[in-house]
Amino acid sequence: MSRLWLIVPAAGQGRRMGAECPKQYLDIAGRPVLAHTLARLHEAFPEAALRLCLDPDDTRFSPEWVPFADWQRVAGGRERVDSVENALASLADVAADDDLVLVHDVARPCVAVEDLRRLREALTTSPEGGLLAAPVADTMKRADARGHVVHTVSREGLWHAMTPQGAPYRVLCRAFAHARGAGVVLTDEASALEAWGLAPRLVPGRRDNLKITHPEDLALATRLLAGDPASRRATGALSDDSLADEARS
């Protein structure tokens, strides 16, 4: 049976938050965002091995926040893609070609355990990789340089990409290498797979798997982790069945 490897890039500075510290160290109920995220991943995959990408000069990190027995600190890069590539390189001597690698944003502490497990199960039969995602529900507008509407964009077939995203180890490595050689700008793992000609599988996930990017996101994540029903309604969080129904509509 293949192993599961988790990569969590956590070397970013989170400048859009405008906070005094990187967003992975912002406090939620007495613990940093990073600790909440790792705890959620561990609840779903206690047997997984973790590669945690941190800034080499990071002095805020504490190993006590890592619940995994098998984990390793990896030097983070200038950009997220650099951190992920460093983590993939660290697995060269230990990961098998068909081992599953999942990459998760450290700033997504609200990801549902059932979604994590469902993603892993889906990717056992998806050699081209895949990702958690949610169908676009809002009306989408294309804007001009002045911030005025140019036209309404059809939301048919549009999805919000989330994380985790992943693929078998060899597939992900080759996709990243191809993108690097072709000069493709990568925003996530799925874009690397796409650039290599693959079609990653979209696995429906809850909408409350939000990424903490702006100050209001932190407040919402705090309420979500506390189990506030109103906050779940505000994010449009749906059950697995309703997400699947919407994806088909």
Swiss-Prot record:
Catalytic activity: 2-C-methyl-D-erythritol 4-phosphate + CTP + H(+) = 4-CDP-2-C-methyl-D-erythritol + diphosphate
Swiss-Prot/TrEMBL site (Positions MEP for the nucleophilic attack) positions: 155, 211
Enzyme Commission no: 2.7.7.60
Species, as recorded: Chromohalobacter salexigens (strain ATCC BAA-138 / DSM 3043 / CIP 106854 / NCIMB 13768 / 1H11)
Role according to the record: Catalyzes the formation of 4-diphosphocytidyl-2-C-methyl-D-erythritol from CTP and 2-C-methyl-D-erythritol 4-phosphate (MEP).
Keyword annotations from UniProtKB, A to Z: Isoprene biosynthesis, Nucleotidyltransferase, Transferase
Pathway stated in the Swiss-Prot or TrEMBL entry: Isoprenoid biosynthesis; isopentenyl diphosphate biosynthesis via DXP pathway; isopentenyl diphosphate from 1-deoxy-D-xylulose 5-phosphate: step 2/6
One GO MF term: 2-C-methyl-D-erythritol 4-phosphate cytidylyltransferase activity
Protein name per the record: 2-C-methyl-D-erythritol 4-phosphate cytidylyltransferase
HAMAP family on file: IspD
Pfam family, one: IspD
Site (Transition state stabilizer): 16, 23
Any GO BP annotation: isopentenyl diphosphate biosynthetic process, methylerythritol 4-phosphate pathway
UniProt entry tagged with the keyword Cytoplasm: no
Enzyme type, top EC level: transferase
Family to which the UniProt record says this protein belongs: Belongs to the IspD/TarI cytidylyltransferase family. IspD subfamily.
